[in-house]
Amino acid sequence: MMLKSYLITDPKLFGDTAETLERALSLAIAEHSPDFICLRDKSSNRYTELAEVFLKIPGRHKALLHGDVDLAVTLGAYGVHLSSLQFDQIARAKEAGLYVIASTHSYEEALAANEADAITYSPIFHSPNKGIPKGLEDLKEITGKINTKIFALGGITTKEQIQQVETCGVYGFASIRYFKENSNV
């Protein structure tokens, strides 16, 4: 099975206006063809406007909104990415027909999020302000214990790191910086 790729936006890299987001994301999608994309912007007071633009960007990807089940349903997103504090919304999101990815940072959280379609597990490598990396051995161990599809996340910025996480049996890799730093954007 081909490793799935999951592009997560950050306003510092992809822009915080509709125009800059659309341009940067369109170029990254054209270059990398990610399987999934997520609009993540925890600080914007224009998230709905950005989400409307985000969901219209062409490509073969499946588009998720971060943290807002109701908006994802209203705007017709493919799914929603829930934080580790939002596991109580997994069932509601699934009932609404959304594909659900949940953020996890421990074995206990991964177990608690087992109703999600997939999880991110992080940080695998060093990532700014994300604490001590879990490392590849920990990732390999968790993929052996958890039946939920796992996206490795955190500090994945090179093709070599993607190959390393692939050997751990993950469903895919997720990254913010990989899609921006390895692109002609």
Question: Where are the language model's segments positioned?
Answer:
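Glycine/Thr-rich beta-alpha phosphate-binding loop at enzyme active sites
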Residues: 75, 79-82, 101-141, 182
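Alpha-helix-loop-beta-strand connector modules within alpha/beta enzyme cores
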Residues: 48-67, 87, 92-106, 132-157
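Catalytic cores of alpha/beta
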Residues: 24, 63-78, 104-117, 144-179
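Glycine-rich phosphate-binding active-site loops on the catalytic face of alpha/beta enzymes
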Residues: 7, 12-13, 83-92, 118-133, ...
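Short, basic/glycine-rich phosphate-binding loops at helix/coil junctions
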Residues: 1-7, 30-35, 118-122
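N-terminal active-site wall of soluble small-molecule enzyme domains
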Residues: 22-96
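Active-site mouth loops of central-metabolism enzymes
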Residues: 2-22, 99-103, 151-152, 156-157
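Acidic-and-aromatic substrate-binding clefts and catalytic sites of carbohydrate-active enzymes
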Residues: 14-16, 44-46, 181
